[in-house]
Amino acid sequence: MRCVPVFVILLLLIASTPSVDATQKTKDDMSLASFHDNAKRILQTLRNTRSCCPEEPCCFWR
C-alpha cells in the first residue's frame, strides 16, 4: 500500500508533461524523450516490485 502514492504521483507527473516541445532547444536542454524513457523505466520498476511490497526484504523503499 505504500507503493500506491508513489505510483500515483509519477502518473500525475507524466500526465502533466507537454506532448509538444514549443521552445527551442539549446545544447544544455534534456530531450523530452529522455524524460519519458526515465519515467517509463521507473514505472516498470514499480510495477515489477508492487507484488512483493508486503514482504519486508523485497520492498526497497520502506
Curated annotation (Swiss-Prot):
Where found? Secreted
> Where is it expressed, tissue-wise?
Expressed by the venom duct.
As for PTM, the annotation reads:
Contains 2 disulfide bonds that can be either 'C1-C3, C2-C4' or 'C1-C4, C2-C3', since these disulfide connectivities have been observed for conotoxins with cysteine framework V (for examples, see AC P0DQQ7 and AC P81755).
Pfam families (UniProt xref): Chi-conotoxin
The region annotated as signal peptide is: 1-22
- Where this protein primarily resides, as one coarse class? secreted
InterPro entries xrefs: T-conotoxin (IPR031565)
Q: Which UniProt keywords apply?
A: Disulfide bond, Secreted, Signal, Toxin
Q: Which GO terms describe its molecular function?
A: toxin activity
Coiled-coil intervals: none
Q: Which residues form the propeptide?
A: 23-50
This entry carries the following GO cellular component terms, namely: extracellular region
The UniProt family comment states: Belongs to the conotoxin T superfamily.
Per the entry's comment, what about the domains? The cysteine framework is V (CC-CC).
Can you say what this protein is called? Answer: Conotoxin Pu5.3
Organism equals Conus pulicarius
Lineage of this protein's species?
Eukaryota, Metazoa, Spiralia, Lophotrochozoa, Mollusca
